[in-house]
Amino acid sequence: MKALYLLGLLAFLYSCSSENVYDLQPESSEEENPGTFLEAIQEQSRTCVPRDGDCTENRKACCRSKIFQDRCQCRKVSQDKVACSCKQPYWLMKIEEILGDIPEKPKPVEGKCVKKHHDCSQRKNDCCPGSMENYTCKCYNTLEEGAKESEICGCVSKADHQILAQGFRYVKRLHDLR
């Protein structure tokens, strides 16, 4: 099991390092019109080379597969000619076969999602994604005045859930001691 976690961590780190990194400093010709620099990046991300397509002109333009980005692999055709095509390394292909299809999140109602720490009791599957991890709707039983139990729900991360659950258990224990 530890080996599987290690393999997953290595695959995640490798995929993070494979993403294209753009220099955010505009070049001298682009200083006059800053919109062209962003437009060029957006156009480059829209036009990617599919698997087995020719990537001789732009070796960083290979499309992403389900999880990982394909690599441009070149081979010598003749003395002075090189042919390049987008391929996926064998071990990355095997990792994708093991992991299978990654299910997509259900679309939120009316194009909006429930923000972090907001009430999600009506829409439990529509929490907004976070920057580092996804939020899930968790519900907690609370004691109101008069020892009446009620349930509150909110979109929280895993760490927030552990902290909140421990806090509610602690308060309930204090209430039971009275």
From Swiss-Prot:
Disulfide bonds: 48-63, 55-72, 62-86, 74-84, 113-128, 120-137, 127-155, 139-153
Similarity-based family: Belongs to the spider toxin CSTX family. Double-CSTX subfamily.
Keyword terms of this UniProt record: Disulfide bond, Secreted, Signal, Toxin
Keyword Signal listed: yes
GO cellular component: extracellular region
Motif range (Processing quadruplet motif): 43-46
Organism: Cheiracanthium punctorium (Yellow sac spider)
Role, per record: Spider venom toxin that exhibits cytolytic activity by forming an alpha-helix across the membrane. Lethal to insect larvae.
Signal peptide coordinates: 1-18
MF (Gene Ontology): toxin activity
Propeptide residue intervals: 19-46
Expression sites (tissue/organ): Expressed by the venom gland.
Post-translational modification: Cleavage of the propeptide depends on the processing quadruplet motif (XXXR, with at least one of X being E).
Protein name: DELTA-miturgitoxin-Cp3a
InterPro entries per record: Spider_toxin_CSTX_knottin, Spider_toxin_CSTX_Knottin_CS
Localisation per UniProt entry: Secreted
